[in-house]
A protein has these predicted regions:
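Conserved NAD+-utilizing ADP-ribose enzyme module
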Residues: 2-6, 12-80, 103-105, 114-127, ...
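Active-site-proximal specificity loops/subdomain of glycosyltransferases
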Residues: 72-96
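A short acidic-Thr-Gly-centered motif at the start of a beta-strand
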Residues: 97-101
Length: 200
């Protein structure tokens, strides 16, 4: 797939961006989504992870976990099922749709300012702090997907999750709020809204 030039909008949530800032997403660059799910550890105050806690508390075919250990185990389970989902989606992309940007090595964007405002409203509803909405010039690739088609965070067989991932990578057909995955050379060309002063 050849790189193309296009403009999109990005809802900034972690660190403010500046006009002229350049971001490169290629096959070796991971995004914060990757780091959040694949590099984060869930440990109790003794340094035990979720699996060790489960093994230490499973006796006589019963499992009793409470307090800090229960929180660590539940966080570990939540992170693990979401990481499995992301791994399946990436596996299907690599095998069947390698021309599309990876969800683990991309920036998430919106096609229009109006869509960016919809994403901001969604983030606000989850109390996720939005710092800015910026306009980006991209020389790279994009994929428009429907997040509702991603594999669910449930216990269905992996074979069904693979089918769900396939449906996602077929592209957005009729979603009210598409997610745009972009990669390549990305430049901030305009700060449209700066909400950071509101959060002081």
């Amino acid at each position: 797939m050849n790189d193309i030039e296009f403009y999109v909008y990005h809802v900034v949530t972690r660190k403010k961006m500046k006009i002229g800032q350049i971001i490169h997403f290629d096959k070796n660059q991971t995004n914060t989504l990757y780091r959040f799910f694949f590099e984060r550890e869930q440990l109790n105050s003794s340094g035990d992870d979720g699996i060790k806690i489960i093994n230490n508390h499973y006796k006589n075919e019963e499992l009793h976990i409470k307090n800090e250990n229960a929180k660590v185990v539940m966080s570990y389970i939540d992170q693990t099922i979401r990481t499995v989902r992301k791994t399946i989606v990436e596996m299907v992309r690599l095998q069947e749709f390698p021309e599309y940007p990876s969800r683990l090595s991309c920036l998430y964007a919106a096609k229009s300012y109006e869509d960016a405002l919809k994403w901001k409203a969604l983030f606000d509803s989850y109390n996720r702090e939005v710092l800015q909405i910026v306009k980006l010039r991209v020389i790279g690739n994009c994929f428009e997907g429907d997040g509702n088609l991603l594999p669910k965070e449930d216990g269905i067989p992996f074979s069904q999750k693979i089918e769900q991932a396939r449906e996602y990578w077929k592209g957005n057909v009729s979603n009210e709020l598409p997610e745009l995955l972009i990669n390549g050379k990305i430049e901030v060309v305009e700060i449209i809204d700066d909400f950071s002063a509101i959060h002081i």
